Amino acid sequence: MAKKLRVGILFGGRSGEHEVSLLSAASVLKAIDRKKFDVVPIGITKQGHWLAPGDAHSLLAGDTSAVARRLRAGDPEATPGAKLLHEGIPTLMVPEPANGESAAKAALSPASPAMLDVVFPVLHGTFGEDGTIQGLFELAGIPYVGSGVLGSSAGMDKDVMKRLFAQAGLPIVKHVTILRSEWEKSPKKAIAQIEKVLKYPVFVKPANLGSSVGISKAHDRKTLGPALDEAAKYDRKLVIEQGVGGELRKGKLGPKARELEVAVLGNDDPKASVVGEIIPGKEFYDYEAKYLSEGSVPIIPAKLTRAESKQIREMAVAAFRACDLAGLARVDFLMEPSGKRRIYINEVNTLPGFTQISMYPKLWEATGVPYTELITRLIEFALERDCEKKRNSYSRDDK
């Protein structure tokens, strides 16, 4: 019988998406194939402390739909794993690549004398999917699920991401990028710069954040200022995008853009899932609509023509390659609600949610890849990518 791989599951983190990460980790720990993998859950507190919980099963306590209700009520202990992050054993990852071994491993100290064979970072947002923790894995010489340092950082920064999309010939909405310092120094000048390029409504976003945290929709100059202030709480760089549909006319909102999503899986030969659609329960698919509201409705597969579906799936793979991604990504699109029904690529998410209501696993399940198999494939792609990296020479003396 083949020896089981020891998989480190990282969750939590210094991020506005900390709670979402705990929910995702609970789902992954419940579904991972225990016949193939030994699991070491590793929590990261909001302050950045690494903890190795003693009892992984505690992470699964509670039903995630109940968790969502408790989160809405502001319960700080609502999420699975919250208790573990108070009771875990302080730990760290030793950046010491293995020498002469068939597989790179990383040690956890002092929580476990054993080595990890691979890491699955179930981390969302800053310090989780922005390339920082991926750099630590590279230093430690350990295989990990997901994109590398470059792809992760590019996939996190909406400004850089859009530049890569444009260079690859992918259609994007008009946008303006300003710095927080520019907005604070000269608000009138910043607003004039935005209004020169874009028409209302516009979406204002922190450049480096996910799960729609800090995003607002502005219908006019009066609402633009507060939207910029909100985004500026989270990042030094602000991205303002042209809205697609949803114009405010005579006090009424026009038809909204269709919000479409595709899950991509693989390394050098990535595959795209069926196309899904989200019907938000609110004006747009914000943080509350994604994780706390029961009003949003996923439609899988989306109601599209065969040609539209083919185009969107091809664009998803092209975006994956343009950002040099690996392992997994969810690619989001906007489609005009009427007229020419033009399709725009919105963004990529390099570590999409794995909660019970997350689209990434749902899209693959609809494509024929069950959740447990999906996790196994992601770990296999991490090992495949590590083998490919081992072919690289890092000095002239390497043999």
What residues fall within each predicted segment?
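Hydrophobic beta-strand scaffold residues
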Residues: 39, 143-144, 172, 202, ...
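A glycine- and small-aliphatic-rich helix-loop capping segment at beta-alpha/alpha-beta transitions
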Residues: 135-144, 220, 225, 366-367
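Solvent-exposed alpha-helix faces
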Residues: 26-27, 229, 317
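ATP-dependent carboxylate activation and anion-phosphoryl transfer catalytic cores
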Residues: 2-5, 11-15, 34, 169, ...
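Phosphate-binding site of ATP-dependent enzymes
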Residues: 216-314, 337-344
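ATP-binding N-terminal substructure of ATP-dependent carboxylate-amine bond-forming enzymes
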Residues: 1-150, 154-156, 160, 167, ...
